[in-house]
Amino acid sequence: MAESKGSTSKEGFGDWCILEAECSDVENDLEKLFDEDTDSDISDLLDDNDLEQGNSRELFHQQECQESEEHLQKLKRKYLSPKAVAQLSPRFESISLSPQQKSKRRLFAEQDSGLELTLTNEAEDVSSEVEVPALDSQPVAGEQSGDIDIHFTALLRANNNRAILMAKFKEAFGVGFYDLTRQFKSYKTCCNAWVISVYAVHDDLLESSKQLLQQHCDYVWIRQTAAMSLFLLCFKVGKNRGTVHKLMMSMLNVHEKQILSEPPKLRNTAAALFWYKGCMGSGGFTYGPYPDWIAQQTILGHQNAEASSFDLSEMIQWAFDNNHMDESDIAYQYAKLAPENSNAVAWLAHNNQARFVRECAAMVRFYKKGQMKEMSMSEWIYARIHEVDGEGHWSTIAKFLRYQQVNFIMFLAALKDLLHAVPKRNCILIYGPPNTGKSAFTMSLIRVLKGRVISFVNSKSQFWLQPLSECKIALLDDVTDPCWIYMDTYLRNGLDGHVVSLDCKHKAPIQTKFPALLLTSNINVHNEVNYRYLHSRIQGFEFPNPFPMKADNTPQFELTDQSWKSFFTRLWQQLELSDHEEEGENGESQRTFQCSTRSANEHL
């Protein structure tokens, strides 16, 4: 018999177990099932009685109170500082003899369900700290040194420490900080006077600063009220805000956040009175004399009565005596005169300063031009060389002319004709190669005699010759072919020494003669046939040699004002200049020009 394929079942599992469910006809009866569905084996499972309202409102109220209490405790934990009690009594906190663990009142109240917890809480409440919001306490003078750390910590916690310092300053001194100062935006702007307010300074350091600041300042003003210390410092040299802060931080051992600094108001009478009266109290300290801006506004003197009125004639007289004819020069120099001149103070206080400066400059030019026209050439040279300080030697000029192979006698003769305005002899030409010293020689002469320089570059303007009507001697430097053509065409009469019509700006053409004229050029006009009509009107001297220089690149021949002063003094007779007019016709000393309303013998 063949074996069956596949696996063989183990013993005991070879037969199938067939079970058959027993069915009954009762389960198929639907009506009976529905009838039995409402019945329950558990009695009174559902309460079918009427419901009552109860006390739900009280329950809701309790839940709301509990939720609010939890929210309040969270806010307390978030915003209240655990060290706030130290600000209430810092001295009491500092006298603790031994460290001990301080218990704090619980933020979240616990349910007291027993006697032991109640007794424990009562024992802890005896030494508990009450947490309150941090307060900015204002210490008295005696408690300041012990409260420095508290003040500084409160200042660092503030979002706007500058606003806090401003408020504390006004509370301490009764005025705002900016009522006494003007604002400097930049930290690099320098000023001699500074107003400095420092918050929470130790008493010992403040006392030492009174002595240390004296070596840096001409005037020291210090006053302390509560935690604020106010300084007015007038330094010997100008300092910027950064330098001032470094000085105060090192001297007072403070942080930069504790310092306010601005320059004082110099023209505010109320601010000046604050500083003047502040030093009279018992708590103030001062060193040095009052600054000028405080003394002028608080101390009554004879200058105050004079400073109220401005005299333009006095300003014109000052500018005339000091040879100030430029508007910017007059304005700057007269403003510098204000500390010692009451009229300058009144001018600074006037609203029409610019108009007065323009009028002053115009009047000085008129006076100077009239004075120049009245003086002869000898008087003009004598007045100019006596304005030169120092002494030189005329031989420097003679040696330079000899170096350039110029006959000194012929040059003196040409210079004499030039100064005396001899017709057809009032123009000298210096010609030669470049770098021979032509311009240096002529410029030095023009400088000492206060002459004018005209430039052909302005020849397109019909007023380019106007400076010739305002001087005794003039220079036309570096004459080129276009300039020679212009002179040959239009300036023959002027070079002859005759009266010409000269067009001037803002006025009608005037009748005048050309002054003594110096020319420099690289062209020898006497060798040019095209300019033959200029040969008899111009005297020429050649400079053929390069200008000599020393090893240190300085000129070997120093053509200075002192050299020309010595030249004219030594050769005064050879140039046939008139005698020195130091005295009048009757032997009396000549009176200086007066253009102010002040009398000659009036007290200054």
UniProtKB/Swiss-Prot annotation:
<dbReference type="InterPro" id="IPR014015">
    <property type="entry name" value="Helicase_SF3_DNA-vir"/>
</dbReference>
<keyword id="KW-0547">Nucleotide-binding</keyword>
<protein>
    <recommendedName>
        <fullName>Replication protein E1</fullName>
        <ecNumber>5.6.2.4</ecNumber>
    </recommendedName>
</protein>
<comment type="function">
    <text>ATP-dependent DNA 3'-5' helicase required for initiation of viral DNA replication. It forms a complex with the viral E2 protein. The E1-E2 complex binds to the replication origin which contains binding sites for both proteins. During the initial step, a dimer of E1 interacts with a dimer of protein E2 leading to a complex that binds the viral origin of replication with high specificity. Then, a second dimer of E1 displaces the E2 dimer in an ATP-dependent manner to form the E1 tetramer.</text>
</comment>
<dbReference type="Pfam" id="PF00519">
    <property type="entry name" value="PPV_E1_C"/>
</dbReference>
<dbReference type="GO" id="GO:0016887">
    <property type="term" value="F:ATP hydrolysis activity"/>
</dbReference>
<keyword id="KW-0832">Ubl conjugation</keyword>
<dbReference type="InterPro" id="IPR046935">
    <property type="entry name" value="PPV_E1_DBD_sf"/>
</dbReference>
<keyword id="KW-0244">Early protein</keyword>
<keyword id="KW-1017">Isopeptide bond</keyword>
<dbReference type="GO" id="GO:0003677">
    <property type="term" value="F:DNA binding"/>
</dbReference>
<feature type="binding site">
    <location>
        <begin position="432"/>
        <end position="439"/>
    </location>
    <ligand>
        <name>ATP</name>
    </ligand>
</feature>
<dbReference type="Pfam" id="PF00524">
    <property type="entry name" value="PPV_E1_N"/>
</dbReference>
<comment type="similarity">
    <text>Belongs to the papillomaviridae E1 protein family.</text>
</comment>
<feature type="domain" description="SF3 helicase">
    <location>
        <begin position="406"/>
        <end position="556"/>
    </location>
</feature>
<keyword id="KW-0235">DNA replication</keyword>
<keyword id="KW-1048">Host nucleus</keyword>
<dbReference type="Pfam" id="PF20450">
    <property type="entry name" value="PPV_E1_DBD"/>
</dbReference>
<dbReference type="InterPro" id="IPR046832">
    <property type="entry name" value="PPV_E1_DBD"/>
</dbReference>
<dbReference type="InterPro" id="IPR016393">
    <property type="entry name" value="Rep_E1_papillomaV"/>
</dbReference>
<dbReference type="GO" id="GO:0006260">
    <property type="term" value="P:DNA replication"/>
</dbReference>
<dbReference type="InterPro" id="IPR001177">
    <property type="entry name" value="PPV_DNA_helicase_E1_C"/>
</dbReference>
<dbReference type="InterPro" id="IPR037102">
    <property type="entry name" value="Znf_lg_T-Ag_D1_dom_sf"/>
</dbReference>
<dbReference type="InterPro" id="IPR027417">
    <property type="entry name" value="P-loop_NTPase"/>
</dbReference>
<dbReference type="GO" id="GO:0042025">
    <property type="term" value="C:host cell nucleus"/>
</dbReference>
<keyword id="KW-0238">DNA-binding</keyword>
<comment type="subunit">
    <text>Can form hexamers. Interacts with E2 protein; this interaction increases E1 DNA binding specificity. Interacts with host DNA polymerase subunit POLA2. Interacts with host single stranded DNA-binding protein RPA1. Interacts with host TOP1; this interaction stimulates the enzymatic activity of TOP1.</text>
</comment>
<keyword id="KW-0413">Isomerase</keyword>
<feature type="compositionally biased region" description="Polar residues">
    <location>
        <begin position="587"/>
        <end position="604"/>
    </location>
</feature>
<feature type="modified residue" description="Phosphoserine; by host">
    <location>
        <position position="81"/>
    </location>
</feature>
<feature type="region of interest" description="DNA-binding region">
    <location>
        <begin position="144"/>
        <end position="307"/>
    </location>
</feature>
<feature type="modified residue" description="Phosphoserine; by host">
    <location>
        <position position="89"/>
    </location>
</feature>
<feature type="region of interest" description="Disordered">
    <location>
        <begin position="579"/>
        <end position="604"/>
    </location>
</feature>
<keyword id="KW-0347">Helicase</keyword>
<dbReference type="GO" id="GO:0003678">
    <property type="term" value="F:DNA helicase activity"/>
</dbReference>
<dbReference type="GO" id="GO:0005524">
    <property type="term" value="F:ATP binding"/>
</dbReference>
<dbReference type="InterPro" id="IPR014000">
    <property type="entry name" value="PPV_DNA_helicase_E1_N"/>
</dbReference>
<keyword id="KW-0597">Phosphoprotein</keyword>
<keyword id="KW-0067">ATP-binding</keyword>
<feature type="short sequence motif" description="Nuclear localization signal">
    <location>
        <begin position="76"/>
        <end position="78"/>
    </location>
</feature>
<feature type="cross-link" description="Glycyl lysine isopeptide (Lys-Gly) (interchain with G-Cter in SUMO)">
    <location>
        <position position="513"/>
    </location>
</feature>
<keyword id="KW-0378">Hydrolase</keyword>
